[in-house]
């Protein structure tokens, strides 16, 4: 049965000044709040060719000491037009008093990552502690991610991957721009 959209009693905030106020432990990452869109490129030795993609990433919070994280990507053709969905993941970044970030990230392809890292000087570096795979998921052994605010409205992303018997190596990079509030999906 379909229910019409309704206002949540405690909606997430996408901006530092919105209510609820960010938890004090989120101070190193409040600049990430919002929706980011842009393009990037990727490749991996097991793929037929390198590729271009568009990406949308959203960070929000509900006043507790973690960020909600959602990312979607679409493969692009040579003219920059979307071909098909290529990746999707969701999760949480848990901020700790010592500046550590514990990230829980899941993908509908059957991959769940637990990563640990640090938030410093506008950058968040994460490396996997554990990867759990559904029985039919492709083998992934490790990932390393770096998110960097190069200015208040630009977020860069680099993703290294160890999968299907290959060592940890470059997989993805993107440059995203902050979306103005009220734009987008």
Swiss-Prot record:
Textual note on the cofactor: Binds 1 heme b group per subunit, that coordinates a highly solvent-exposed Fe(III) atom.
Region (Disordered) residue spans: 1-21
One of the Pfam families matching this protein, by short name: THAP4_heme-bd
Reactions it catalyzes: peroxynitrite = nitrate
Signal peptide, first to last residue: none
Record keywords: Heme, Iron, Isomerase, Metal-binding
Cofactor: heme b
Metabolic or biological pathway: Nitrogen metabolism
Keyword Acyltransferase appears in the UniProt entry: no
Keyword Ligase: no
UniProt-listed Enzyme Commission number(s): 5.99.-.-
InterPro entries: Calycin, Nb(III)_bact/plant, Nitrobindin, THAP4-like_heme-bd
Short sequence motif GXWXGXG: positions: 34-40
Residues noted as binding heme b in the record, renumbered to the chain: 171
Subunit text: Homodimer.
Record function comment: Heme-binding protein able to scavenge peroxynitrite and to protect free L-tyrosine against peroxynitrite-mediated nitration, by acting as a peroxynitrite isomerase that converts peroxynitrite to nitrate. Therefore, this protein likely plays a role in peroxynitrite sensing and in the detoxification of reactive nitrogen and oxygen species (RNS and ROS, respectively). Is able to bind nitric oxide (NO) in vitro, but may act as a sensor of peroxynitrite levels in vivo.
Family to which this protein belongs: Belongs to the nitrobindin family.
Domain note: Forms a 10-stranded antiparallel beta-barrel structure able to accommodate a hydrophobic ligand in its interior. In fact, this fold hosts the heme group, which is located in a wide surface cleft.
Protein name: Peroxynitrite isomerase
Originating species: Streptomyces griseus subsp. griseus (strain JCM 4626 / CBS 651.72 / NBRC 13350 / KCC S-0626 / ISP 5235)
């Amino acid at each position: 049965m379909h229910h019409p959209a309704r206002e949540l009693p405690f909606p997430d905030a996408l901006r530092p000044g919105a209510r609820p106020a960010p938890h004090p432990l989120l101070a190193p990452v409040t600049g990430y709040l919002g929706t980011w869109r842009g393009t990037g490129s990727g490749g991996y030795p097991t793929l037929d060719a390198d590729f271009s993609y568009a990406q949308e990433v959203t960070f929000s919070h509900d006043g507790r000491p973690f960020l909600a994280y959602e990312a979607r990507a679409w493969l692009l053709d040579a003219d920059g037009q979307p071909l098909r969905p290529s990746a999707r993941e969701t999760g949480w970044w848990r901020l700790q008093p010592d500046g550590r970030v514990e990230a829980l990230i899941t993908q509908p392809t059957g991959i769940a990552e637990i990563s640990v890292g640090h938030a410093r000087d506008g950058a968040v570096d994460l490396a996997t502690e554990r990867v759990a795979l559904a029985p039919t998921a492709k083998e992934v052994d490790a990932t390393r991610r770096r998110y960097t605010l190069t200015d208040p409205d630009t977020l860069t992303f680099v993703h290294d991957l160890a999968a299907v018997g290959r060592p940890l190596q470059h997989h993805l990079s993107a440059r995203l721009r902050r979306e103005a509030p009220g734009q987008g999906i």
